């Protein structure tokens, strides 16, 4: 066979695998830290499937290097903040959040809201820098993207989608009080059995816990509607040239990909345009580096404990570090501790410090017995995926809530970072390692995580491709978005029906009074005769 005909046959075969019509263009509004890591997993899969992905990132973005030879196209827009300034602000606010006094609800959540508003101001300034950049916006319009993809906790993507007349897909873990989910997405969270995120309650609440949950919900609703959204509403109205709100603009999203799952979250109703894709980043463990593998194998039958408080915790106080190190020195297991700071004086021979650890690969190692975690959702999903019981030491944000969920499901023990003693940590580790119930419970969650008809990552990619193929998914969007709040709750209908009932009762009473008056009059007339 000639070279010419061989080439033709190869091209025909390749045409079955690649089709220019099936490849789309995705515009991404960048996120930071763990939010970006989850999005990146989806984006890399989209690139693998032949789609063109453009990430819109500020010049202050921490995780993006325009010179990095990545398959993702990075479109950098200038902003007034420098990368160092932005990183310092984030670390300061996270440090402040983790140190907030938890004595009273009002004090904790009011100060937490201030931190969220600070982040909101920064994000809004980034958004202004984008939409006011006429050259960049013209370039984006010419690119004719098929979909905008973003983490909903960082607003602006919905404004870009509106300006570019492009469908929108959200990825989201949570927002405080489920504010965006409820008021923008129309999600349903009945407070009678769905605990407000960050309340640390379970779905089986006592009467007083339901009262507490209702107060939390009303507090977050009030702060969101009265204070938090005013600046966004004004900004969006100015840019679009018509009165609008953040809730209205976000409510136009075609699909919400929630990074949650039913083995993690408590059951509650979902809308047709919402799908759970929690644990999409989880994957089988890879072999460990040689030195680390040797250390793990040296643990023998006792196994190892993996310890990480995440990338946001640096320069731990010496007193706390020594308390933890002293506890770890007392257990028979070897410990791999992700730690960036001064070496604790009480560090035992069984513990090794690392500035970075391959967490997923360690959790998937057969010798791993327990995971000490701050309660970040990524780490918890990896522990569930590999079936490793946890000791939770939550610090801020959704971490206390995440650990509360794992504790309610019998897969974790919780400790308080500021008050725990060495004895507390030792006892917690002994409990989750030696009590077989914890292993059984987390293995049950693991089996559920693995037993899905379609993997979370494949579902996430499917919905993005679905939106690109059909130029949106408006057929899944509930009509509730088009109703006012009193129409949504049928208050106008209830008012009308009450008015009808009141009118009927009024007429009946009038008739009765009239009849009574008639009979009374006749009686008097008869007596007089």
From Swiss-Prot:
Glycans are attached at residues 67-68. It is found in: Microsome membrane; Endoplasmic reticulum membrane. Its EC number is 2.4.1.17. It is a single-pass membrane protein. It holds the Pfam family UDPGT. GO terms for molecular function: glucuronosyltransferase activity. UDPGT is of major importance in the conjugation and subsequent elimination of potentially toxic xenobiotics and endogenous compounds. This isozyme displays activity toward 3-hydroxyandrogens. It is principally active on C19 steroids having a hydroxyl group at position 3-alpha of the steroid molecule and also active on planar phenols and bile acids. This is UDP-glucuronosyltransferase 2B18. It comes from Macaca fascicularis. The lineage of its organism: Eukaryota, Metazoa, Chordata, Craniata, Vertebrata. The gene is UGT2B18.
